[in-house]
Amino acid sequence: MTMPLQIYNTTRRELAESVLTEVVTTVLQEEGFLIESLVAVYCGNKMIHRINREFLGHDYPTDTITFSYSKGSEIDGEFYISLDAVEENALRYKVGFDEELMRVTIHSALHLAGYQDGKDEERVQMQEKEALYLKRFVTPST
């Protein structure tokens, strides 16, 4: 039996995979999608840099790369998240690692749901959705 959502962690950092699964599943379900087959890979900058260069022609690491092969309301795809980039983002935005990991995971799920962030108005809509879902999964630090 195959799992519709498979999470792979290629790093030594421990991740709360059950929480990440809940986040991805919730976002996609609430956006009107079912997961047919989804692979989530949490990796380091070296791996995501290689993927970014090979598949997108960008010669630098990034926080997330999403590939969607979906048709209709069934999600078929994969996403890669660099935990190194998540850590850098967390420092830059002065938030905890776990909160930034949730945000980037939500961001990846939203890409799979069809949201884009290439234009300013798309980015604003994406950030609003991220904030909406983030409130549900992250307790704000004081």
UniProtKB/Swiss-Prot annotation:
Keywords: Cytoplasm, Endonuclease, Hydrolase, Metal-binding, Nuclease, Ribosome biogenesis, rRNA processing, Zinc
GO cellular component, one term: cytoplasm
EC number per UniProt: 3.1.-.-
GO molecular function, one term: metalloendopeptidase activity
Subcellular compartments: Cytoplasm
Any Pfam family hit: YbeY
Disulfide cysteine pairs (residue numbers): none
Positions contributing to Zn(2+) binding: 107, 111, 117
GO biological processes: rRNA processing
InterPro entries, per database record: MetalPrtase_cat_dom_sf_prd, YbeY, YbeY_CS
Major site of localization recorded for this protein: cytoplasm
Domain of life: Bacteria
Needed co-factor(s): Zn(2+)
Cofactor comment: Binds 1 zinc ion.
The protein's role, per its UniProt record: Single strand-specific metallo-endoribonuclease involved in late-stage 70S ribosome quality control and in maturation of the 3' terminus of the 16S rRNA.
Family recorded in the similarity comment: Belongs to the endoribonuclease YbeY family.
Record protein name field: Endoribonuclease YbeY
Organism whose genome encodes this protein: Chlorobium phaeobacteroides (strain DSM 266 / SMG 266 / 2430)
